[in-house]
UniProtKB/Swiss-Prot annotation:
One of its GO terms (cellular component) is plasma membrane. This is C4-dicarboxylate transporter DcuA. InterPro entries: Anaer_Dcu_memb_transpt (IPR004668). It is a multi-pass membrane protein. The keyword Cytoplasm does not apply. The gene is dcuA. The chain crosses the membrane at residues 21-41, 46-66, 99-119, 142-162, 171-191, 228-248, 264-284, 295-315, 327-347, 375-395, 419-439. It comes from Helicobacter pylori (strain J99 / ATCC 700824) (Campylobacter pylori J99).
Amino acid sequence: MVDAFFQIIVLLFSLFLGARLGGLGVGYAGGLGVLILCLFLGLNPGKIPFDVILIIMAVISAISAMQKAGGLDYLVQIAEKILRKHPKQINYLAPSVAYFLTILAGTGHTVFSLIPVIVEVSQSQNIKPKAPLSLAVVSSQVAITASPVSAAVVFMSGILEPLGADYLTLLMVWIPTTFLACMLTAFVMGFTDLKLDSDPNYLERLKAGKISPPMMKKEKETSKSAKLSLWIFIGGVVAIVFYASAISKNIALISPVILGRDYAIVSFMLSVATLIAIFCKINANEIAHSSVFKSGMQACVCVLGVAWLGDTFVSNHIDEIKRYASFLIADYPFLLAVALFLASMLLYSQAATSKALIPSVITALGISANHTEHLYIIVASFASVSALFVLPTYPTLLGAIAMDHTGTTKMGRYVFDHAFLIPGVLVVFLSVALGFVVAPLVL
């Protein structure tokens, strides 16, 4: 009991240290935690999530190639046009555009490019930017749990498919429930005071001359290679969804399966990157310098350290976890969503949280191919791994706060009371609630 107490202290200390260091420090601190747990507290090292890391690397490589060819900018340009064309609907369009950008790209960092546009359009309509900004940032995080190419979804489909929930079925649950949750949250936020000219912070900045009027940006010309790179990438995503569905046990269009789903995603994405490099004539040596590549490789290190730390602790206490979790979650299914929510707050990654906890939960609930009565709990609760918005240190949150020159999107005085907390909790709560309605019907 005493040993377990010290192990939990080391686990929590490593997570808090990682959050404090930020960036790559999240992964570094995870490695430090593994070192202390194994060498000083006698635990056996857990499994390193190489499959998740490889998928992230492959997807990020393809997106980075598309970014280098101008395809990512073209995608953002399309999003900008939509936002500027219907400015009065910014509260619904900002989260919608952010959501579908993330669904397609598999990373929430695409929202960075939208932030200045959201601020401009909101300001021109006398709407506080904090509402559409917070909705867009949170939507980009929860969309990771519905993106066909995100590491989290790929991992979950891989572990749940042998239990009878194939790739396409899971997407049929996660995409509509998470998107509808984003729209319902936008509707609820519409009842708050959204008038920009009623915000004292904004009026003070306006009086001091710190705020310039919204500027309409001139439309850039898009090269053929930018458009081509986007279509190649979209083709790759569609091919992955089709292939993963075709090799699933329920559909079984391709049999025998020579290339498994994880390997297929890696090879498809690397092939997409190759085609972009060839046909869009980009310099492959420069891809590593792109912002997407850097943030993606940072994510790999974070997943490496944090997921390894989580698996080291969990795998050494699997019997105790099984004993308590089996009856608690079976009797109170929502507790899994709460546990995933709290874990993702600290682990800072949907994929890392899923990798660290879901295998243990499956074992604890006794789920197998022959016993799937509790499978819906895991599928419905998955969206709750999106609580990256709780601590205001995530890059997209900080970017939204920094780029909102109106001053309406603020850091909380008491850390947690920031602009993203309420919409974030609402989106996750509604996603999970809708999941508990839809999952039993679809599975």
